[in-house]
Curated annotation (Swiss-Prot):
Name of protein: O-acyltransferase ausQ
EC number: 2.3.1.-
PANTHER family registered for this protein in UniProt: FAMILY REGULATORY PROTEIN, PUTATIVE (AFU_ORTHOLOGUE AFUA_3G14730)-RELATED (PTHR31896), TRICHOTHECENE 3-O-ACETYLTRANSFERASE (PTHR31896:SF64)
Family the entry assigns: Belongs to the fumigaclavine B O-acetyltransferase family.
Organism superkingdom: Eukaryota
GO molecular function list: acyltransferase activity
GO biological process: terpenoid biosynthetic process
Gene3D superfamilies assigned to the protein according to its UniProt record, in alphabetical order: Chloramphenicol acetyltransferase-like domain
Subunit: Monomer.
Keywords assigned: Acyltransferase, Transferase
Source species of the chain: Aspergillus calidoustus
Function: O-acyltransferase; part of the gene cluster that mediates the biosynthesis of calidodehydroaustin, a fungal meroterpenoid. The first step of the pathway is the synthesis of 3,5-dimethylorsellinic acid by the polyketide synthase ausA. 3,5-dimethylorsellinic acid is then prenylated by the polyprenyl transferase ausN. Further epoxidation by the FAD-dependent monooxygenase ausM and cyclization by the probable terpene cyclase ausL lead to the formation of protoaustinoid A.
Pathway: Secondary metabolite biosynthesis; terpenoid biosynthesis
Keyword Transferase in annotation: yes
Length: 502
């Protein structure tokens, strides 16, 4: 292991610090043939990773200018080991083969917290690790779980670590060299343009709640439950095509309201995000009104939803793709739960409908359109969004407060067939995000396929966390039930349409 003095302490950016110290987890499953060789490969790869990026072995402490990453102290007897190996003799891989398809999906229960190297919430007033690893040995393989401190990494930054680790396992001689991920840029994070940009607002007083004042803060939070939902790629493509077929009408409606430029396409990610947010909003409304007779509850509700947006390319100059720090801020949009009577639509609308009732279809199409409009203008508006996020009321970021109806982030652009870990580990069977702890969290998981030839028909796996009452209603929403894999059959595997998935 490299010496702890191999890097200079640095202060985390205001955007890093705004996310707070909470750990999230990536869990990668492998069906290994030689357990000893696999363990040796992982340990060697982690050592090499620390040699190239020694700050990963650091710890986070409070300093004059805020949170700081420094070399670890040597006298911390209770310090969580950097790498742990645990055997679970009564467990098997959390992997399920999806019917006759070539795809694996996460088994429909959350990974046990025992698989995680440390707790999600760190001990207050103590130095906190930057990253920790745990190798979980089960009867038919192993699960490598990586715990990332959100004050140091966002989801994409953590994915850089996974890519570097894969390269360290597969081809250690080339890690960090030309043609591979450049680690040097991540080590100079303190000089990044993002630090200079966000530091402009560092001295602004963030609103602090000295004591909880609203019922939402003081009430006991409802029990949370989470499941991995498997969406049929064929159904989502049909829904996307249907939404795109009515873009002319949606563009005309938007021009009447705001004079916005035309939207040229809606991606599968837009449409899936819209479907998830629409169905969660409907489920929350239904959970609050146990009587499903909408005639007794004619009032509509407006729900705010959030979607994480990567600002690496918006910053001037742009941040490198391998920037590991936080560079994501929320894009906000609203959903109204009111459903009008079935509109009398032209035949073109009726023919475009993929199978949902017309009101649900139009609501999803309009929300997907709103998302695309906001994404198109995000380059001009992200500064305001960033300023707002950095100066948000801290009481609204507490883990027990419902910050939004739904919070969607997507890792779909990460493709497991591009993450080759070498012969000892083999291909990734599933790529999970562990257990989210926020009510309304929706994580679109990485594209899990063994080759690009079948990527186009790979299911969309989404880990969703909701309170129990809302989850019950959510699982009974017709639009959700229609879109899930069990309700459809994939077509012949095909190549991935990158523009469609963007």
């Amino acid at each position: 292991m490299p010496s702890s003095s191999d890097f200079e302490a640095f202060t985390l950016t205001p955007l890093d610090q705004a996310n707070g110290q909470v750990f999230f987890f990536y869990s990668l499953s492998y069906r290994v043939q030689d357990e000893a060789s696999a363990l040796h490969t992982i340990h060697k790869a982690i050592d090499l990773l620390l040699e190239k990026a020694p700050f990963l072995n650091g710890e986070i402490v409070f300093a004059t200018d805020g949170l700081e990453v420094r070399p670890p102290t040597t006298d911390s007897e209770d310090r969580v080991p950097l790498v742990q190996v645990k055997r679970h003799s009564n467990r098997t891989l959390p992997v399920e083969k999806l019917g006759q398809s070539p795809f694996n999906v996460p088994r429909n229960f959350p990974l046990d917290a025992l698989f995680n190297p440390l707790a999600a919430l760190p001990t207050p007033d103590r130095p906190t690790p930057v990253i920790r690893f745990q190798v979980n040995l089960v009867n038919d393989g192993l699960v490598l779980t990586i715990g990332f401190n959100h004050a140091v990494f966002d989801a994409l930054g953590a994915a850089v670590i996974v890519k570097l680790l894969a390269e360290s396992c597969r081809n250690p001689a080339n890690v960090g060299r030309e043609g591979s991920l450049e680690i040097a840029s991540t080590q100079s994070r303190v000089r990044s343009p993002l630090l200079a940009l966000t530091s402009r607002w560092k001295k602004l007083d963030r609103v602090r709640a000295d004591a909880p004042s609203s019922p939402e803060v003081t009430a006991v939070p409802p029990p949370l439950t989470d499941e991995c939902f498997v969406f049929c790629a064929d159904k989502l493509q049909r829904l996307r095509a249907a939404c795109n077929s009515i873009l002319c009408q949606l563009n005309e409606n938007q021009k009447l309201l705001a004079g916005q430029p035309d939207v040229r396409f809606l991606s599968t990610n837009d449409v899936l995000t819209a479907l998830i947010c629409e169905t969660i909003a409907q489920a929350r409304h239904a959970a609050r009104h146990t009587c499903r007779d909408e005639g007794l509850h004619p009032e509509s509700t407006v729900s705010e939803c959030l979607m994480a947006v990567n600002i690496r390319k918006f910053v001037d100059p742009p941040l490198p793709d391998d920037y590991m720090g936080n560079a994501g801020i929320p894009l906000r949009f609203q959903i109204e739960t009111r459903r009008d009577a079935e509109p009398d639509l032209p035949r073109a609308f009726q023919e475009a409908n993929p199978g949902l009732n017309t009101s649900s279809f139009l609501a999803i199409a309009e929300t997907a359109y709103t998302i695309r409009i906001k994404l198109a203008s995000f380059g001009d508006s992200y500064i305001d969004s960033l300023r707002s996020f950095l100066n948000a009321d801290e009481s609204q970021t507490a883990v027990h407060v419902l910050p939004a109806c739904a919070i969607v982030s997507s890792l779909r652009h990460i493709k497991t067939y591009e993450l080759q870990f070498g012969a000892e580990l083999g291909e990734i069977r599933t790529f999970e995000t562990g257990i989210p702890w926020v009510n309304g969290s929706c994580v679109i998981l990485p594209l899990c396929a063994n080759s690009s030839e079948v990527a186009g028909s790979a299911p969309w796996n989404v880990r969703i966390t909701l309170d129990e009452g809302t989850m019950y209603c959510f699982k009974n929403e017709p639009a959700l039930r229609w879109a899930l894999w069990e309700q459809g059959r994939s077509k012949v595997p095909g190549s991935c349409d990158c523009k469609a998935d963007a």
